[in-house]
Amino acid sequence: MRAAISRRFPTAPGFPRDAGAYLKGVEDAYVADAYHSLSIEGYRVSLELIERVRSGNWNPEVHEHDREQTNAMAARGYWQSFQVVKKSIGRVMGGENPGTVAEVGHREWYREMFAPSVAAGILKPADLAGYRGGQVYIRQSMHVPPSRDAVRDAMPAFFDLLTQETDPAVRVVLGHFVFAYIHPYMDGNGRMARFLMNLMMAASGYPWVVSPLAERGAYMAALEKASVGEDIGPFADLLASLVGKRLAGEPLPAVPKKSI
């Protein structure tokens, strides 16, 4: 898989010299990233909702609508998780190994992603501790993720490999793919995998990449081919194309101004 990935990817720009400028670029990508990442997972979000929860105008203890609105909780959780992912990127900018940063940080990303469900009384804090405690299945996929017991062995091994990996493209592609393949949580695995992918992007100076909703079919088909057909090529091609567009200065995928 490694050779198939490396020859497809653009050359890495190298470690960013200006960490502040890089992090500003990440922040500027937030709205597009939140809209497309959440929409890929089936949530119905809008520019207005994303901006509202980001501004802090979200309170399930006061507003019943926010407590009952699944989309609002997902959007708020995405914003909270995005903040700690940025902190992880800051640690990588400070010279820490991206694999180590991901291993330590991904649990906090996950807790923040579902913290609004805890605030609304839907989940208990204990529900967010550790990896999944049961089997998970992926809709419209022939891939069956490992058992809960296998996950406990697979995740440390995964992070060990990620920590030792030196090829920027391999870190990006396999970081996303293997996390999604293991599916360590009952929910949120796609969002987590894309966060992990972008942390690996930052480690080599690639810009933050947004997976467009319009390419959801190709994205899911490429993951399926890698998971079931053991062919990482289409997935590597898809990510390489997105990276290439960003390096060429193309704008991020658009966000509709009206609610969907």
Language model region names:
Residues 1-260:
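FIC/Doc superfamily catalytic core
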